[in-house]
């Protein structure tokens, strides 16, 4: 009887651990910017941010990162140098630096764009989403993000951040996550997005849902 109770307890612990490690889905515009701000507020040691487009309409995120820096958190932000239609927003760039945030622009010619939108907190949790840091992304657009707790996945996102921060190549041939571009450059496999997406489509048995702003090759 005691053995049976212990077994049930262990099963419950296992199920709880799975639930805690499961990604949390954020859906916009319903969820708004609060989940992102809450994640930033939880940081105690380090925040890594990689962002394609950041406009002054999202100064609330600038302020949240500045507050983290003031309480001793090391905050680094990597911004796309030339997003489509213009250059990096200087107001955002300067506002981040004024608040003690380390800011760099992406290395020229390394990629066409660094289109990633991610944030890593204390190397324990990561935000990966479709949304830029703009007003419409959290208030008017259909966007999605996942908050990840899996240690290996979070470590991989941080590892790619460090490589892009330094403008270095990184072998992603054994990647856990999906990365673009799907190319081999200088003998280094830098991504797996194309083959992963095609395998997912080809593996469909009953249904396939695809929601995308644009599709081209």
Model-derived segments and spans:
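Charged, low-complexity intrinsically disordered terminal segments
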Residues: 2-5, 9-10, 16-106, 110-217
């Amino acid at each position: 009887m005691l053995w049976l109770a212990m077994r049930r307890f262990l099963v419950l612990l296992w199920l709880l651990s799975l639930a805690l490690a499961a990604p949390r889905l954020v859906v916009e515009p319903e969820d708004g910017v609060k989940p992102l701000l809450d994640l930033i507020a939880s940081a105690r040691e380090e925040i890594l941010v990689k962002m394609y487009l950041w406009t002054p309409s999202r100064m609330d995120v600038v302020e949240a990162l500045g507050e983290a820096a003031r309480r001793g958190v090391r905050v680094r932000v990597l911004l796309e140098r030339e997003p489509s239609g213009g250059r990096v927003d200087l107001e955002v760039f300067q506002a981040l630096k004024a608040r003690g945030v380390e800011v760099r622009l992406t290395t020229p010619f390394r990629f066409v764009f660094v289109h990633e939108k991610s944030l890593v907190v204390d190397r324990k949790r990561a935000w990966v989403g479709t949304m830029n840091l703009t007003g419409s992304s959290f208030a008017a657009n259909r966007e999605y993000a996942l908050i990840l707790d899996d240690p290996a996945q979070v470590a991989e996102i941080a590892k790619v951040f460090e490589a892009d921060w330094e403008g270095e190549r990184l072998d992603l041939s054994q990647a856990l996550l999906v990365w673009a571009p799907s190319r081999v450059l200088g003998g280094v496999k830098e991504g797996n997005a194309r083959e992963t997406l095609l395998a997912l489509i080809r593996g469909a048995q009953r249904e396939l849902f695809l929601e995308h702003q644009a599709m081209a090759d």
